[in-house]
Every structure is written in structure tokens, then in C-alpha cells.
Amino acid sequence: MEKSEIKGFIAKRCAKELKDGDVVNLGIGLPTLIPHYLPEGVEVIIHAELGIVSAGKAPKEGDENYDPYHVVDAGGSPASVAYGGGFIDSASNFGLIRGGHVDACFLGALEVDAEGNLANWIIPGKKMPGMGGAMDLCVGAKHCIVCMEHTAKG
């Protein structure tokens, strides 16, 4: 398999874990590809840490909804809001997570040990220091799935 195909392969496999109607939180990076691979007939509600309930697929440059300056995901990449979606404040947002209302979360990681412990909190000098809502999601979501390449080189 070509390196360029690996992330899509992982996202497609992750999408198979979802059921129609699931409330899903997607971490930054690879997890944002998952909506592009949802099985036919499976519609999910995408919850975003920045307060979007019912986020749309990540738009690409040239798409009608592409606007890199107004709606972004937790990683700062362009995002969209699905028809009927909306925005909530941070307290309500984390109330959804901590209250057990998220069916599944998909997180990226730096590494995972043999017991499944997740390390994703910092790479010195990189853009995204800190774990964001990962702690809350690991505890509050009904299922937590780490999606990442096996090695830094794929």
C-alpha cells in the first residue's frame, strides 16, 4: 500500500465502527477523514470540541463551504456545519462529553503503549501543545478509538 493511501485506509476502517445516529467526536488530523468513508445509510452527528454540534465533512479548497477564516476545527483546519447543526458554549459542550452523551471519539496520538495508554499531550515546538479535550473524551465517551499510523514514516 502506498503511503498516500494509509490514512484513508485507517479512516475507512474507523468509519465501520459507527452506527446510524451515533454522536461522534473527531480529534484533529487523521480522524477528520472519517466522515468521507461512512458506510451507506449511516448518518452520524459530529460533535466538535469547539462547540459545533452536527459538523459537516471537512471542506476542501474550491468547495462551496470552504472558508478557512470563519469555521475551523480544533486543529485550526477549515470545518463546516451540517444542515440543522449549530453552536453551543464551552460549558454545554463539555457537559455533553462528561455526561456520557458522546457514543464514540476518534483521537490521534503520538504513541500508544502495550496496555492501550494514550500519549498525545505535547511535542515541544509543535503547533498543538496540550491534550485539548482528550482527557474528557477518554473518560466521557462510550468508546474511545485511537487512529494513527503505526510509525512516524507510515
Q: Where are each of the predicted segments found?
A:
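Conserved phosphate- and dinucleotide-binding cores of soluble alpha/beta proteins
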Residues: 2-9, 60-154
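N-terminal active-site beta-alpha-beta segment that forms phosphate/nucleotide-binding
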Residues: 1-82
